[in-house]
Amino acid sequence: MGALPRVPLITAPTRLHPVDGLAPRRVLVKRDDENSPVFGGCKTRALEFVLGAARAAGATAVLTSGTAGSNHVAATALHAGRLGFRVTALVLPQEPGALVARNLRLAAGAGARLEPVPDGVSVHPDRERHRAAVAELRERGERVHVIPFGGADPVAGVAHALAGLELAEQARGLPGPLRVHLPAASTLTAAGIAAGLALSGLPFQVTAVDVVGSSSTLGPGLLGRAREVAALLGGPADAVRPEHVRHVGYAGAPYGVPDPEAGRCADLLREAADVRVDECYGAKAFHHLLGEVGDADGTHLFWHTGSTREAGEVFGPVPPELLCYVE
């Protein structure tokens, strides 16, 4: 694989934060929430390559999509805006909450144009709503770069694989196998991390904890995606073996809805180590980790995929249809 276009957005490697007293074994937290003061987390790692491709293509604007409180939409609005791109996001409804309000405020405050899309209307690039948005931007004279829903661009997998290789270097010498837990929707982050760890030769297992709440997201897709990323990096696809990856359901609460048990785990993590995770996604994966850490040997690690930036007084024009999320 030749060198891919990339823009510098993060500071890496991010640290491994030890947490004692919450489980029979020490737990490590991979602090990717600290990789950028603008907006941290796995979405920003991915944007280094996604926005690198946009810049290389000569784009003046990016069009993406996500739910109303999407971490990806907020990250894109902030980072792409700072690089001079005009940002439009097609946003779908979801349950309201503190995380949704924060991300909407950050995206609007960064100047993103947020276009509400009714429930049931597809924003897939092949569908009418998405095609109309592209056509409108082009009519304004923009050169548009499309970023898939939630940032699930194939080049994002490369960013996550490099993160996996980064972790492998940090974890050498720790008791094996390395057991990584993280929240998952599209599973691309988990797939990339698994690919990087597999190519490193380190004994490991990546557990992607589904936060979508739909059985349709579970199945063999994670292994296939991880193998695709490994091949994209020039390695053997079968370096990622079936036992390297797990995609497990989370029964506590549906997508975007806090779960009381997971919320209590988030409180414990904050009290024990001053590490803050959101209750909708990160807390669910951490809850799952705590339920397994006593039964399996090795080193248990929670990958903090979110951003802990507060919205503060940042605010921009929010479409009337989205005001219900921030009021």
Curated annotation (Swiss-Prot):
The keyword Isomerase applies. It catalyses: isonocardicin C = nocardicin C; isonocardicin A = nocardicin A. The keyword Iron does not apply. Its EC number is 5.1.1.14. Disruption phenotype: Disruption of the gene abolishes nocardicin A production, but the mutant retains the ability to produce the intermediate isonocardicin A. One of its GO terms (biological process) is proteinogenic amino acid metabolic process. Pathway: Antibiotic biosynthesis. The modification N6-(pyridoxal phosphate)lysine is found at residue 43. Belongs to the ACC deaminase/D-cysteine desulfhydrase family. PANTHER family: 1-AMINOCYCLOPROPANE-1-CARBOXYLATE DEAMINASE-RELATED (PTHR43780:SF2). Involved in the biosynthesis of the beta-lactam antibiotic nocardicin A. Catalyzes the interconversion of the nocardicin homoseryl side chain in both nocardicin A with isonocardicin A, and nocardicin C with isonocardicin C. This is Nocardicin C-9' epimerase.
